[in-house]
Structure formats: C-alpha cells, structure tokens
C-alpha cells in the first residue's frame, strides 16, 4: 500500500510539472504574438516588399496569413510561405465585394492595409490629375473600401486590430519641403480616416493606428533607402505586438515613436 501511495504521489508531481510547463509555454507564445492557432491576419498588397515580408514573419510565427494581390497567379513567393492568396484590386468595388464573399463569416484578428502606390510629382505644374486621382483611389479610398467590407469579420476577431500603412510625409505639421503632390494628400487623408475609425470603433475594443514603415529599400523606396525591408518589418512587428488601447488613434513609426499629425 505504501508503495502504491508513493507511486501516486510521483504521478501527481509529474502531472503538476507538466501543467506548469504547458502554461508557461502558452504564456510565452501569447506574449510573443504567436498564440497562433486561432489568429488570422489579412495583408493587402502582400505579393512583394513590406507586405511580403510581413506575411513571411506572421506565417513563421504561426498565424494564418491571408495575402492579397492584384495578380495572384504571379504571387509565387507569397504562396510558397503557405499563405492563403486571394485576388484583390482595392480600387475595384466588385473585387472587394468578392473578397468579402470569399471570407464569409471567418474572423479576422488583424487587417493591415498595406497596398499603396507613389507616383512622383514635385511641382504644381507637373501635377497630372489622373495620376493624382489614382493615388487617392489606391492609398485612401482603397483602405476605406476594404475596411468597410471586412468590418463584420474584424468584429468577430479576437485582436480587433487595424493597421493602415502611411508615410512620414503625410504629416501636415512636419511638411517643410512641399512636393510629393498626390502622395502626401492621399496618405494624410488615410490618417484622418484612421483617426475617425479609432473614435468610432474604440469603444468596441478595436485598436486602429497609422504606421510609418520608414524609408525602406523596396521598389517604391528605391535602392538608396537606408532601411532594409527586414529591419522595417521587425520594427513593425514589435510595435504591433505591444499595442494597447492607449495607442488607439495614434500615428506611429516602425521604431515605436509617435508622430505629429
């Protein structure tokens, strides 16, 4: 009988150690943003540059990644990550509606509106209205379309996080050089949309921010940009992982700094 009790005590002790270890591991995963099994992130413009690297990092952390591309057949790198690749043109309402139908009622924990374009116009005389309109359509109206269409999915999600990728040159307070016609305006309007969104959805537990990724060495940023895609995305992940309700409606950089509107 004594031997039986001793054996039972050993089993009980082993079970306690196992439970404690499992809880500790789960806590660590959650802290690191993994808590992966039920987490889904949707990234627009995920076939290259910052969007592709974000997809790579979140997939590696165990998240289910939904990456959009205008031409999904060409998104081979994105598909190789194990991401779910979906066709999306953010300027086409029918395409956005198609995305919403494809998702159905699936919860989305985080939406990253990353798709964007920059068509350089330095002086007023150089402004081409069609190019100006194009930047507004992609950089401003596009995120509005996508966020509105996916709001039911985001409401069903756990994290309820909306990250709109902006630029430091969208800051009105810091504009001391002019230029970048169309691009500045499109991103400044995105900032205002995000601030209004934060005020509306904050009471529901949402965190809505705009985030400047830095001047990054991508097709858009060019070869002279000082920041690699990996450096930018590592910073973004750290910022996003540390967000709290106090950050709702803020303008942040990839380094975690707050910017003036």
Q: Where are each of the predicted segments found?
A:
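Rossmann-fold scaffold of SDR-type NAD(P)-dependent oxidoreductases
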Residues: 44, 108-116, 139, 164, ...
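N-terminal Rossmann NAD(P)H-binding glycine-rich loop of SDR-like oxidoreductase domains
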Residues: 47, 51-56
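A short helix-coil junction within the Rossmann-fold of NAD(P)-dependent oxidoreductases
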Residues: 57, 61, 105-106, 118-122, ...
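Conserved glycine-rich Rossmann-like NAD(P)H-binding loop of the short-chain dehydrogenase/reductase
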Residues: 61-76
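Conserved Rossmann-fold cofactor-binding substructure of NAD(P)-dependent oxidoreductases
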Residues: 91-106
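Catalytic loop of short-chain dehydrogenase/reductase
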Residues: 117, 125-136, 141-144, 155-202
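C-terminal helical subdomain
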Residues: 203, 210-213, 222-261
């Amino acid at each position: 009988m004594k031997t039986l009790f001793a054996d039972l005590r050993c089993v009980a002790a082993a079970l306690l150690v196992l439970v404690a270890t499992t809880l500790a591991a789960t806590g660590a995963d959650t802290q690191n943003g993994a808590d992966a099994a039920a987490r889904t992130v949707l990234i627009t413009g995920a076939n290259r540059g910052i969007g592709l690297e974000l997809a790579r990092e979140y997939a590696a952390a165990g998240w289910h990644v939904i990456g959009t591309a205008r031409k999904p057949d060409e998104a081979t790198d994105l598909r190789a990550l194990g991401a779910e690749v979906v066709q999306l043109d953010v300027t086409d309402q029918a395409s956005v509606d198609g995305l919403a139908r494809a998702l159905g009622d699936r919860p989305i924990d985080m939406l990253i509106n990353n798709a964007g374009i920059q068509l350089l116009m330095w002086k007023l005389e150089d402004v081409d209205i069609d190019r100006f309109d194009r930047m507004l359509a992609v950089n401003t109206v596009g995120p509005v379309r996508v966020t509105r269409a996916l709001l039911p999915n985001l409401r069903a999600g756990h994290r309820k996080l909306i990250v709109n990728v902006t630029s430091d040159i969208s800051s009105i307070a810091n504009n001391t050089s002019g230029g970048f016609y169309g691009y500045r305006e499109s991103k400044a309007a995105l900032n205002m949309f995000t601030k209004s969104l934060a005020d509306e959805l904050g009471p529901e537990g949402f965190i809505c921010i705009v985030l400047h990724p830095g001047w990054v060495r991508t097709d858009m940023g060019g070869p002279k940009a000082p920041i690699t895609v990996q450096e930018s995305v590592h910073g973004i992940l750290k910022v996003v992982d540390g967000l709290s309700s106090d950050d709702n409606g803020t303008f942040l950089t990839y380094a975690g700094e707050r910017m003036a509107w």
